[in-house]
Swiss-Prot record:
It holds the Pfam family HHH_2. This is DNA ligase. It comes from the Bacteria. It catalyses: NAD(+) + (deoxyribonucleotide)n-3'-hydroxyl + 5'-phospho-(deoxyribonucleotide)m = (deoxyribonucleotide)n+m + AMP + beta-nicotinamide D-nucleotide. Gene3D superfamilies: 5' to 3' exonuclease, C-terminal subdomain, 6.20.10.30, BRCT domain, DNA ligase/mRNA capping enzyme, Helix hairpin bin, Nucleic acid-binding proteins. Zn(2+) binds at residues 421, 424, 439, 445. GO terms for molecular function: DNA binding; DNA ligase (NAD+) activity; metal ion binding. One of its GO terms (biological process) is DNA repair. Keywords: DNA damage, DNA repair, DNA replication, Ligase, Magnesium, Manganese, Metal-binding, NAD, Zinc. Belongs to the NAD-dependent DNA ligase family. LigA subfamily. NCBIfam families: dnlj, PRK07956.1.
Length: 686
């Protein structure tokens, strides 16, 4: 198949060349929409479709009725009955830059003969899911269909009825006779990750991304399979509407608010904006929140809010004039896999790291990506020399999510997972039920020892400022440190012999080490690097037991009483304290002066927070996050990092995001910062 990513406009373009480009696009569309198995990143498809548009604009006599630019989507799958849409489900035009957005506004101005900056827009995140139509007749869900090719979709009613956040009956008296909801069905990241973990544990194929997972789940012929998948709907508009009781609002935003009031889920990030600067501000705000939303988005959707103006603007062949998708920089790109290196982590985990031909992804040059583990290498079928698809989302480490199979070179080289540690040459084993293979060398392995020391000094552990990764590596290379306790035995002369370490730098490092001696029990526990004991678990252990001695002597059953501690973590803790080397290091740290304040709980009558599970979210102005957490601990609370059905209170500061939304959905009691501060004052007064 020819590669058209470098297609250039010229005066000798032939119909044969154009048809080859169209065929390539059709092949990509078929794999994306029908097989749910994309061959190339969205960015590559976007580049090719835009090239085709440009060519057809320059040479309109070459446009054909079946060109990919002249239709919306893909054909329905043969396994589902077809549904004709009364109102076409069209796609949106894309904007990829501020210039594109400005051109969109100029087109509106020219069409309406008015200043587009005077228009109000309804702004929404662009969810990366599957567009659907859901029809309610007299308030009861009767029919659901995919978008398909825009005029004909697939009947997925049985599957949609299994999605928990879609009401089977509208929450209203006198419902409209016919109400068609248009929306996006997607899979939240937490559910997607859990689904893939279950699949890998069973030896089944995992999904490349949440969109593929949502599409595959929605197109199951057995609704019982769909029922087990964590799908959700966010409505973004209304299609057919017939009612003898009420007229719809003439504001798109107000229509979405009305949908929410009758039980239809609507995205929590939807806002109104007026004019170019506010549209850019919304785009920037959503882009900044992207990594924390809990679901995949690939841009924003900007719609003229006034329905009357929408109707005046109307449509072009395949999209409305009154809306545009302003997309984020591509998070997926193609590049060449040059080699694979195997790294050893703090707990001995062997991680394959892909060495890539450097390429720009989401504004950052990427030359390394994770391949996770041996199962992932096998699932991808990837080889050295392959053209691979890499994905970078937010601050997540770039990963390879697929290969372009038809571009594999003849000299591609198979990736062989090591059976011996690449650092200490100890045996590599994989425990049954785990995806990760591990070096058995323990602290004999220099790589594990180095990573354990880096973890010990890190910000969320002992927070030793000025002692970073490079200094740890130098200290180990000179054999000045072997265990965390050795850090507290360093002297100025030893440090001054190191590279870029003068007298002042050495003293600053020693001052930081001295300062770190006063810590908290939770930080100290976390710094020890006990496997599966993260920051939150360490905090829960400290709050529950109150002292290190109590934690050291607790048995498995006592440990399991702690929130978030199950059988596996409890056994890891018991095993850690049974290892005399670990006990010796801890005792040496305490002998070197590491200490912490006792955890004191305030004894207050009628304390509504005692023994409650509390989650903090958003930005607090009257307290730092650590101050708020400490106050809650003193009041006898269990402070968690995630909202769940076990959460009793959510304390929400400014710019609270998905945790607030989830708490509202679960009916959890919510305190804003002022209410929290008032409660603290009241309890302190009592």
């Amino acid at each position: 198949m020819p590669l058209f990513s470098q297609f250039e406009l010229s005066n000798n373009i032939t119909p044969t060349q154009l048809e080859a480009l169209r065929d390539q696009l059709r092949e990509y569309e078929y794999h994306y929409h029908v097989l749910n198995n994309p061959l190339v990143p969205d960015a590559e498809y976007d580049r090719l479709i835009n090239q085709l548009k440009n060519i057809e604009q320059q040479y309109p006599e070459l446009i054909t009725p079946d060109s990919p630019t002249q239709r919306v989507g893909a054909k329905p799958l043969a396994g589902f009955a077809q549904v004709a849409h009364e109102m076409p489900m069209l796609s949106l035009d894309n904007a990829f830059s501020e210039t594109d957005l400005d051109n969109f506004l100029r087109r509106i101005e020219n069409y309406l003969s008015l200043d587009a900056n005077q228009l109000t827009f309804c702004c929404e995140p662009k969810l990366d899911g599957l567009a659907v139509s859901i029809l309610y007749i007299d308030g009861v869900l009767q029919l659901a269909a995919t978008r398909g090719d825009g005029t004909t979709g697939e009947n997925i009613t049985a599957n949609v009825r299994t999605i928990r956040n879609i009401p089977l009956k509208l929450k209203m008296a006198n419902p409209p006779h016919r109400l068609e909801i248009r929306g996006e069905i997607f899979m939240p990241l937490k559910g997607f990750n859990a689904l893939n973990q279950r699949a890998l544990a069973k030896g089944e194929k995992s999904f490349a991304n949440p969109r593929n997972a949502a599409a595959g789940s929605l197109r199951q012929l057995d609704p019982q399979i769909t029922r087990q998948r964590p799908l959700m709907l966010n409505a973004y508009g209304i299609g057919v509407y017939e009612s003898n009781y009420q007229r719809l609002p003439t504001s798109h935003y107000a229509r979405l608010e009305w949908l929410k009031s009758i039980g239809i889920p609507v995205n929590a990030e939807i806002r109104l904006a007026r004019g170019y600067p506010q549209l850019l501000a919304f785009y920037a705000d959503i882009q900044a929140k992207r990594a924390d939303l809990g679901y995949d988005i690939d841009g924003t959707v900007l719609k003229v809010d006034d329905i009357t103006i929408q109707e005046t603007l109307g449509f072009i062949s395949r999209s409305p004039r009154w809306a545009i998708a302003y997309k984020f920089p591509a998070q997926e790109e193609m590049t060449i896999l040059k080699d694979v290196e195997f790294q050893v982590g703090r707990t001995g985990a062997i991680t394959p790291v892909a060495k890539l031909e450097p390429t720009l992804v989401a504004g950052v040059t990427v030359s390394n990506a994770t391949l996770h583990n041996g199962d992932e290498i096998e699932r991808l079928g990837v080889a050295i020399g392959d053209t691979v698809i890499i994905r970078r989302a937010g601050d997540v480490i770039p990963q390879i999510i697929g290969i372009v199979a038809d571009r594999r070179p003849a000299n591609a080289k198979k990736i062989v997972f090591p059976t011996a540690c690449p650092v200490c040459h100890s045996a590599v084993i994989r425990i049954a039920g785990e995806a990760v293979a591990r070096c058995t060398g323990g602290l004999f392995c220099p790589a594990q020892r180095k990573e354990a020391l880096k973890h010990f000094v890190s910000r969320k552990a002992m927070n030793i400022d000025g002692v970073g990764e490079k200094l740890i590596e130098q200290l180990m290379a000179r054999e000045l440190i072997h265990t965390p306790a050795d850090l507290f035995k360093l002297d100025p002369l030893s440090l001054m012999r190191l590279e870029r370490m003068g007298e002042k730098s050495a003293q600053n490092a020693l001052n930081s080490i001295e300062k770190a001696k006063h810590t908290t029990l939770a930080r100290f526990l976390f710094s020890l690097g006990i496997r599966d004991v993260g920051e939150t678990t360490a905090l829960n252990l400290a709050n529950h037991f109150g002292s290190l001695e109590n934690i050291r002597t607790a048995n498995v059953e006592q440990l399991k009483e702690v929130q978030d501690v199950g059988e596996v973590v409890a056994n890891r803790l018991v095993c850690f304290w049974q290892e005399q080397h670990n006990v010796a290091v801890v005792e040496e740290l305490i002998a070197q002066g590491v200490h912490w304040d006792n955890i004191v709980q305030l004894e207050i009558a009628d304390n509504p927070l005692k023994d409650k599970n509390v989650v903090l979210t958003g930005t607090l102005t009257q307290f730092s996050r650590d101050q708020a957490r400490k106050l809650l601990q003193q009041l006898g609370c269990k402070v968690s990092s995630a909202v769940s059905t076990k959460t009793d209170f959510l304390i929400a500061g400014e710019k609270a995001g998905t945790k607030l939304t989830k708490a509202e959905q679960l009916g959890i009691r919510i305190l804003d910062e002022h209410a929290f501060a008032d409660l603290i004052k009241q309890l302190e007064y009592e």
